[in-house]
Amino acid sequence: MTQWDLKTVLSLPQYPGEFLHPVVYACTAVMLLCLLASVITYILHQSAIRISRKGRHALLNFCFHAALTFTVFAGGINRTQHPILCQAVGIALHYSTLSTMLWIGVTARNIYKQVTKKALPCPGADQPPYPKQPLLRFYLISGGVPFIICGVTAATNIRNYGTEDEDVAYCWMAWEPSLGAFYGPAAFIALVTCVYFLCTYVQLRRHPERRYELRERTEEQQRLAVPESGHRHGVRPGTPPTCDALAASQLQNEHSFKAQLRAAAFTLFLFTATWTFGALAVSQGHFLDMIFSCLYGAFCVTLGLFVLIHHCAKREDVWQCWWSCCPSRGDTSTTKPGAHPTLDANGDALGHTACLQDSPCPGKLRGFGHPPASHCKMTNLQAAQGHVSCLSPATPCCAKMHCEQLMEEEAAHIHMAEEDVYPHDPHLHDPHLHRCLKGRTKSHYFSRHQAAAAEREYAYHIPSSLDGSPHSSRSESPTSSLEGPMGMHTLACCAQADPFPMVSQPEGGDTSPGLYGCPPHLSPGPAHLEMLRRTQSLPFGGPSQNGLLQGDVREGLPFGTDGTGNIRTGPWKNETTV
């Protein structure tokens, strides 16, 4: 290839020409694909992604207007042969550019308002909740102001748009009208946005405790939280409740305020730089146009990838939405017949051990693998082992839809002879019990850790008796008890207190099942029996889970012993010699 051929490939004919540099089209297409993927994700999974309503509308409108700006630029900036089309291109570029910058300013304003927002009132306080403000004002500002500016400019003189003379090779505005109609408003918008950024940064430096965006509880959740605060362990009667921000609200956005601030500032910089290099690419000479076209392509791809990575790839809730749409990433317990199920402290199989999407764990943050220390419904042995298993607010559907069937199965199994069926107990693998506990699919980088945790839990939860025999703990335990009127389905659908308090309850925990909407009581009857939870015994010679030495069995067991040294375990006495 000769030197002349190389120049022909890398550069374009003298302006005016029909096409721009090839890198402009390629990089614009990549950016459009990234923005399109982000928009589709946030539209289809808007209820599953933890982002505020204002933030979602601002992001979607920014992506739409940015895509419109660069699409019109790449497709029509050099269409000078058609005057009417050239004027339409100039009007569209004028409107979309101002609207995109205004939506970035709206994002900066929302971040500042959230940082400077007053602390949320405690549950049960007499203060009225914050009124929900409509989003129409944002659309009137971000869409109405550019529309008015473009309308006034075009109504004054339509020739302000298009080509000013024959020597101009691009479709834009005349120089003098553009100073007051575009460059002045754009500079003012950028200045106000930077002021919002600076004020937000100062507030975050003054108040480092303000890290995440919170949302208020609904009225129903606040009513449920008021009686819950009076039944917490470790709180003396008459003590005023503490106002915990995370207890009164849930996380509204997975990203912190600092991450949102950095993302908005970097987005404004990338958009401004991309627009500037694009303008220089079509207005400069024969050699500089290639340099600025490459710079435009680099910043254009960076803008699209940054939006996709920050708003989608760096969010665990978005990853879970993506994997849920993939049919090959279904539930591993159903696709792999030889895989061992994850067992809880009672030996029951669980679909997922992590908190669900709408779980009542306000301190649970997506993307972090450390479970919160409180506010979660945990059984005693799960609290000791550090495993958190939260139930979904949709738990009452299990009791409502499958109550009749579970009561029939319970009545059928109560009269069966006791036998050692662990771990092939039909209650452990009942699909009706696990349907309401089914959680969202974990992201791909948690799969290996979850598999390893499942192996360890499967090996740990093999029941054993006090003498070390793995057969006596299940076969010698009572199958049912008349301790309470609740049905057996409450063990799978509701969080109840352990009838064998071998482990002290976690501080701040709540054993009331009313938080999840479970019925407080059922009509007593002979069919409403409650299955006793299976317990695990610890070997002698070491401290038990309640802090007592295993050498003194009488002190550590929840039931007393008779004179012969046998253990009384409840309504029926299982004679187990110590």
UniProtKB/Swiss-Prot annotation:
Membrane topology: Multi-pass membrane protein
Segments for region (Disordered): 216-236, 463-486, 537-578
GO molecular function list: G protein-coupled receptor activity
Extracellular side: 1-22, 78-87, 159-178, 284-289
Entries under InterPro entries matching the protein: Adhesion_GPCR_A, GPCR_2-like_7TM, GPCR_2_secretin-like, GPCR_2_secretin-like_CS
Membrane topology (Cytoplasmic): 44-56, 109-137, 200-262
Residue ranges, compositional bias (Polar residues): 537-548
Compartments it resides in: Membrane
Ranges of biased composition (kind: Low complexity): 469-481
Residues spanning the membrane: 23-43, 57-77, 88-108, 138-158, 179-199, 263-283, 290-310
Keyword Ribosomal protein set for record: no
Gene Ontology process terms (BP): cell surface receptor signaling pathway
Keywords: Membrane, Receptor, Transmembrane, Transmembrane helix
Distribution of this protein across tissues and organs: Predominantly expressed in CNS.
One annotated Gene Ontology cellular component of this protein: membrane
Primary residence: membrane
Pfam families reported for this sequence: 7tm_2
Record flagged with keyword Lipid metabolism: no
Family classification: Belongs to the G-protein coupled receptor 2 family. Adhesion G-protein coupled receptor (ADGR) subfamily.
The protein's name in its UniProt record: Adhesion G protein-coupled receptor A1
Organism the protein comes from: Mus musculus
Taxonomic lineage of the native organism: Eukaryota, Metazoa, Chordata, Craniata, Vertebrata
